[in-house]
Amino acid sequence: PRSTHCISSAASDVYKRQIDTAHGHTKKVGDAIKKIKKLRPKKTAICAGNIATEEGAKFLVGLGVDIIKVGIGPGSICTTRLVAGIGVPQLSAILNVKKGIGKSKTRLIADGGIKFSGDIAKALAAGADAVMIGSLFAGTDEAPGKKIKKNGKLYKYFRGMGSIGAMNKGSADRYFQSKQKDTSKYVAEGVEGYIKYKGGVDKIIYNLSLIHI
C-alpha cells in the first residue's frame, strides 16, 4: 500500500501518516499500520483506507487508526466495480463503516461519490466527518492540467488514480501492481479524459457552502 506523510503547519506539532490503498482490509495494510505505530512519534495521526464494510472498520479501529477513508469504486472516473466486480454504494458503505466504528473516536472520510451538493449532505448525515471531492473540482483553474480548446470550447484533462496515466506516475502500488515491471501490463481501474473548463473553484465552493444539515 502507498504510504504518505506530512508535517502540519507550525501551529501544530502533530504528524500525519496515510496508508492509501484500494483495499484497506488486508494483512499488508495491518502490517504497515503496526510498523508505523512502532516507529512513529507519539503525536502522529494515522489515516487508513479504503474500506466499505463494518468488518473492515472494526479491523482498522482495532489497529488504532485515527481516520478511516471510505469508498470502493464510487468515483466518477473509477472503474473498479467494472474491472474487479467489487464495490458498495457509497451511502451504504458510510453506514456500514460508521456502525463498525461504534463509540470509538475514529473519524470517517467519505472518499468519492460526491457528484452533487446533495451528496455531501447525505454523506454527513450518514455519519461522515468529512468528504473528499474530485470531479466537482476537476476542470477548474486550481486543478492540474492545461486548458485545451476543442470545437470552440475549453476543456481540461483529468484522470482517475487507477488510470494507466496515473499508474505510470506512481499510483500502481495503490492497486497492488507495483511489482509489475512491464507497465504495458497494468490493469487499469480508472479512466482518463477531458472535462469542460469551469473557471475558478471559488464559485463551486460557494455553492457547496450553502448546504445546511
Locate the predicted segments by residue:
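Single conserved hydrophobic/aromatic residue that forms the stacking wall/gate
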Residues: 1-11, 15, 212
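Gly-rich Lys/Arg/Thr-decorated short loops/hinges at beta-loop-alpha junctions or inter-strand turns
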Residues: 13-16, 74-82
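Catalytic beta/alpha-barrel core
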Residues: 16-25, 45-50, 71, 87
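Short, ordered loop/turn segments at secondary-structure junctions
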Residues: 21-24, 51-53, 72-75, 113-114, ...
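Active-site-adjacent beta->alpha loops and helix N-cap segments on the catalytic face
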Residues: 22-40, 54-58, 77-95, 145
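Short beta-strand/loop segments at the ligand-binding rim of alpha/beta enzyme cores
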Residues: 39-52, 101-111
